[in-house]
């Protein structure tokens, strides 16, 4: 199947968890994966394009593109949407980031190959290509999947928010 998937995202890290490795993003995964993700580190917030071959067998994630992001103080009504008693206010967030994957498939029957080219945009109009097309491989039980994730390395249930405004699939 050939299709394009585009989504509008905003990353809202937990201000009490600075430098604790929060991650959230947009992913295509199967036995391997590629993702556009937001990451917090001791050096700030970054947008990264990553891929991982042999992910199901513990493969290493490679960072293919990285750019720093500025966090902007959110307005009060929006901040209150993400209010949690023990998290200091106000919240800060990235600007809106648009992510896109163009998936192309070729072949017939059991001999189909697919690839996904990832892009991002800061305005929803001009998209920047990220790396080379990613070879999409099916998962263990079903085909490859498109989705979102939000996680961090420490064990606590107060991670960042990934605000998904919308997702659109087109032919």
Task: Please describe what each predicted stretch is.
Residues 1-171:
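Extracellular glycan-recognition regions
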């Amino acid at each position: 199947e050939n299709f394009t998937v585009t989504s509008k995202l905003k990353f809202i890290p937990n201000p009490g968890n600075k430098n604790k490795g929060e991650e959230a993003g947009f992913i295509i995964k199967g036995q391997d994966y590629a993702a556009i993700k937001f990451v917090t580190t001791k050096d700030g917030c970054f947008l990264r394009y990553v891929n991982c071959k042999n992910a199901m067998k513990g493969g290493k994630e490679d960072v293919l593109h990285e750019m720093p992001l500025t966090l902007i103080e959110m307005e009060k009504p929006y901040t209150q949407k993400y209010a949690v008693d023990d998290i200091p206010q106000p919240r800060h967030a990235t600007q809106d980031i648009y992510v896109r994957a163009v998936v192309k498939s070729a072949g017939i029957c059991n001999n189909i190959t697919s690839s996904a080219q990832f892009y991002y945009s800061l305005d929803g109009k001009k998209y920047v290509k990220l790396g080379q097309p990613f070879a999409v491989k099916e998962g263990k039980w079903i085909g490859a999947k498109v989705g979102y994730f939000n996680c961090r390395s420490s064990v606590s249930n107060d991670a960042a928010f990934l605000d998904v405004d919308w997702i659109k699939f087109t032919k």
